[in-house]
């Protein structure tokens, strides 16, 4: 199974968008999966259901940071990492038009609720939500990039 399908499967099992993406790449990260899952959960729903930057995009950025940056505080490190994130975000925008959670939901003609509690994951939820496809798209872009860079 490719990582994009794995991410979509994880989302369909009830994980947040942010968790699904990072867990699909967890074997590449020197942090155990349980900690990764906890670390990125607040990013789901566009940062705690505030419908800002898509949680899947945020987790993709974290994978890039872990794999391509270092702990040094210098401009070269920052600029190299930022350039990769910008490239991958632009690839996502080409396919999906935006990285904003609210806008992605509106494209699916859904009413956008900001804040509040997570919705119950029912079959109806999965039918109407674009999130599984979005998680797949983010993970596919990241997977392709990592293959280009011969990381996987």
Residue ranges, per PLM feature:
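Short cysteine clusters
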Residues: 17, 54, 101
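Transmembrane alpha-helix interface/packing and boundary motifs in multi-pass membrane proteins
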Residues: 43-50
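Acidic-glycine-rich active-site phosphate/pyrophosphate-binding loop
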Residues: 24-42, 111-116
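Polybasic, low-complexity association/targeting segments
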Residues: 1-13
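Phosphate-handling active-site elements
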Residues: 29-38, 66-87
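DPxDG-like acidic metal-binding loop motif
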Residues: 58-67
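C-terminal binding/interaction regions
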Residues: 85-152
């Amino acid at each position: 199974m490719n990582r994009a399908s794995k991410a979509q499967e994880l989302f369909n099992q009830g994980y947040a968008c942010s968790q699904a993406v990072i867990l699909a790449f967890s074997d590449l990260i020197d942090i155990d999966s349980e900690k990764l899952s906890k670390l990125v959960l607040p990013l789901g729903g566009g940062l705690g259901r505030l419908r800002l930057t898509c949680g899947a995009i945020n987790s993709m950025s974290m994978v890039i940071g872990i794999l391509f940056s270092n702990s040094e505080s210098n401009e070269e490190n920052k600029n190299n990492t930022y350039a990769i994130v910008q490239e991958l975000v632009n690839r996502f925008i080409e396919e999906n038009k935006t990285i904003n959670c609210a806008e992605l939901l509106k494209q699916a003609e859904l009413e956008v609720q900001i804040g509040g509690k997570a919705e119950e994951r029912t079959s109806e939820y999965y039918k109407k939500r674009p999130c599984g496809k979005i998680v797949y798209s983010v993970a596919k872009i990241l997977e392709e990039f990592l293959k280009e860079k011969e990381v996987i």
